[in-house]
A protein has these predicted regions:
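Single-stranded nucleic acid-binding surfaces, predominantly the OB-fold ssDNA-binding core
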Residues: 1-100
């Protein structure tokens, strides 16, 4: 079974804490990146959510920072009020740190 592990390093375009207390980061990645050891390309933008609320509180991330992320990719599906299905590819961060 593929577990969609991913490691990314990129520039933070947006960072905020959502209503549930989780850090959410929009990350621009300009180098090749890998999922389960397979190169999935470069020059991508990812929505990243810190899986653990306590880690969200301890991590100080600002727009423009260089951030390294480890976690896993997941396709989230939900229905809108009108009944249309929406799909979002999200990186759930298990670890992250700001790079110098």
């Amino acid at each position: 079974m593929v577990n969609n592990e991913i490691k990314l390093r990129g520039k933070v375009l947006r960072a905020y804490v959502n209503d549930d207390g989780h850090l959410v980061v929009t990350l621009a990645v300009l180098h090749p990146h890998y999922v389960d050891g397979v190169n999935i390309g470069s020059e991508s933008v990812f929505r990243c959510v810190m899986a653990d609320r306590k880690r969200s509180e301890s991590l100080d991330v600002l727009e423009g920072d260089s951030l390294e992320v480890e976690g896993y990719l997941r396709l989230d599906r939900h229905l809108s009020v009108s009944g249309r299905e929406h799909k979002n590819l999200t990186v759930y961060m298990e670890a992250a740190h700001v790079c110098a």
